[in-house]
């Protein structure tokens, strides 16, 4: 089979049309081909792939990708090529979330490999230094070792300016968000308000929905100051259900949302658990 390719120009034109029409842009993470196929059929605009999504699809928490137990970029490239691309019809574009701090990779070659398989969008969240608390000892150690947000900004700029790819920035803090938008000028920027709550592997603490909307809107305002044309989407924290996303749309000035666990891990857990339990509860009538 041959999956239809979507050019960068077509992706950007489609995004502009939705922004102009005030239609929410939806980005969805997928850790398996089945989930990606279902998301595309449902109408998502972008399927993003990253090692955390693949780990989630196998029952681990997203944060497993933060430990040096796998080659994050190789995991992402392999399952994107083998599981995701063959499952799609070409309606949704694919964004590969990459680790720009990989010391064993020339990111030009990684980005070129993405393009060769038909992926014309890249993000810095695979994982990102922005995950790590800047007051922590591990952040200081990482910085001294050259593992920095600077490399992520460089990759996003290179993807957009040199590789003609759609660049999708993501940050967890106002400081990182401003830097990424101001220096990398990504086509799309996602403010990550924190780990998604709920489910078997979800985070039980975090912000309320109202707090999520407030901090997201604050980030949007700061990002627009340095990059007025950026497309802004929300993600994380209390954004778990469709009604939560609706609240974010109604109470922020962004252009859409990015779903992760909300449209893959959580519905899979719920549906499979119920179906399996219904079968497991069967008994002989005689």
Task: Give the label of every model feature segment.
Residues 1-6, 213-233, 239-286:
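Alpha/beta catalytic cores of nucleotide-metabolism and tRNA/nucleoside-modifying enzymes
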Residues 59-70, 133-134, 201-212, 262-286:
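C-terminal helical cap(s) of enzyme catalytic domains, especially alpha/beta-barrels
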Residues 33-42, 104-113, 174-184, 237-254:
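Catalytic cores of alpha/beta
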Residues 46-58, 117-133, 186-202, 251-275:
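Glycine-rich phosphate-binding active-site loops on the catalytic face of alpha/beta enzymes
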Residues 35, 42, 46, 63-150, ...:
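Active-site beta->alpha loop and helix N-cap motifs at the rims of alpha/beta catalytic domains
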Residues 12-27, 87-99, 158-170, 219-237:
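Short beta-strand/loop segments at the ligand-binding rim of alpha/beta enzyme cores
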């Amino acid at each position: 089979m041959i999956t239809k390719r979507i050019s960068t120009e077509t992706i950007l034109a489609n995004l502009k049309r939705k922004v102009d029409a005030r239609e929410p842009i939806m980005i969805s993470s997928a850790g398996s081909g089945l989930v990606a196929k279902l998301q595309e059929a449902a109408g998502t605009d972008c399927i993003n792939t990253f090692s955390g999504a693949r780990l989630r699809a196998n029952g681990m928490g997203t944060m497993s990708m933060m430990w040096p137990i796998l080659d994050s970029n190789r995991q992402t490239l392999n399952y994107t090529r083998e599981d995701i691309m063959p499952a799609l019809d070409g309606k949704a574009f694919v964004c590969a979330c990459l680790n720009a701090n990989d010391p064993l990779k020339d990111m030009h070659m990684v980005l070129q490999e993405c393009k060769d398989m038909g992926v014309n969008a890249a993000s810095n969240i695979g994982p990102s230094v922005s995950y790590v608390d800047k007051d922590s000892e591990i952040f200081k150690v990482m910085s001294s070792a050259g593992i920095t947000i600077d490399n992520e900004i460089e990759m996003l700029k290179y993807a957009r300016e040199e590789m003609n790819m759609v660049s999708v920035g993501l940050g967890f803090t106002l400081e990182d968000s401003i830097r990424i938008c101001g220096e990398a000028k990504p086509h799309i920027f996602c403010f990550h308000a924190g780990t998604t709550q709920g489910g078997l592997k979800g985070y039980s603490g975090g912000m309320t929905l109202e707090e999520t909307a407030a901090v997201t809107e604050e980030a949007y305002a700061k990002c627009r100051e340095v990059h007025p044309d950026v497309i802004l989407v929300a993600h994380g924290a209390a954004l778990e259900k469709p009604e939560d996303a609706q609240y974010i749309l109604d109470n922020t000035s962004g252009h859409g949302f990015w779903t992760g666990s909300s449209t893959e891990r959580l519905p899979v857990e719920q549906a499979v658990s119920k179906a399996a339990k219904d079968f497991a509860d069967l008994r002989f009538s005689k």
